[in-house]
């Protein structure tokens, strides 16, 4: 495969929230945001790869002043743009700009109640703001088929039982919502901490239900939007799944550096210095590294996956990554 079909660009590590399961540790590390000239260079390098989609994530992409220029430049290059937002600050002008510039927008909401969501997302008031953002975005996008608006719910042990109530809630509040995605929290980033795995990672029974199509069918009776439920295991990148064709997106850090593997620390170079195709080939070579395959091929439980994550992050992360990992706060 000479180029990725999709790219995830964490365009900033700045974030108003402090999510307990954040894979990028946004808000706990320098933002590494680029100025417009270098943002434009990264955009042009991505367009050269001809992916179907670029996902703008973070951090909170909407804190980047040039995010809409980025989206417009990508779309003018024939690439669809998918924005992820926590919805913390969306004045009317921002809602209008999102509707104008994006192909798809997803609001992250992790519970059917403020108590649950705010605890997991690390800031009081974040549930109400996210719900308001989803309402205003769905209203603004109504009648505009070129923009899809959805909600992403990261499933943890403590919010699992709220899933049916959440389906009913969003169906009532957002009648024109396009989709809802329920994905298991993965033991990556902050969620790879031993305490988080012990207390908040989904149980084996909860994981079984997320994999059970009849469970998803039951949830579909509560809402009109399209619904997807996933164990997110494809992101683990076990060798046999790569062989089966589960090729991940290219993961780009805020300053243009490309990760070898999307959910693990470790980069292979920068789009500001080398062609994207060169970096993609270098990334794919990492997937077959015996040190990687030996850790991932036996990671069949969340606990084992978390252990593999911690080892890979320390193995391939740079000195700054290693220092940040050592300073991670204990959970709970």
Residue ranges and their predicted role:
Residues 8, 108, 316-319:
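Intrinsically disordered, low-complexity peptide-like regions
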Residues 45-48, 73-76, 136, 169-172, ...:
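Residues within well-ordered alpha-helical secondary structure of globular protein domains
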Residues 1, 257-332:
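Flexible mid-to-C-terminal extensions adjoining Fe-S/redox cofactors in radical SAM and related proteins
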Residues 7, 26, 54, 82, ...:
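Short, functionally important structural connectors and interaction interfaces within domains
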Residues 28, 143, 289-292:
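Charged, solvent-exposed alpha-helical segments that act as regulatory interaction surfaces
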Residues 1-97, 101-103:
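Conserved alpha-helical substructure of the radical SAM core
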Residues 101-110, 115-247, 251-259, 263-274:
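Radical SAM enzyme [4Fe-4S]-AdoMet core and its adjacent flexible, acidic
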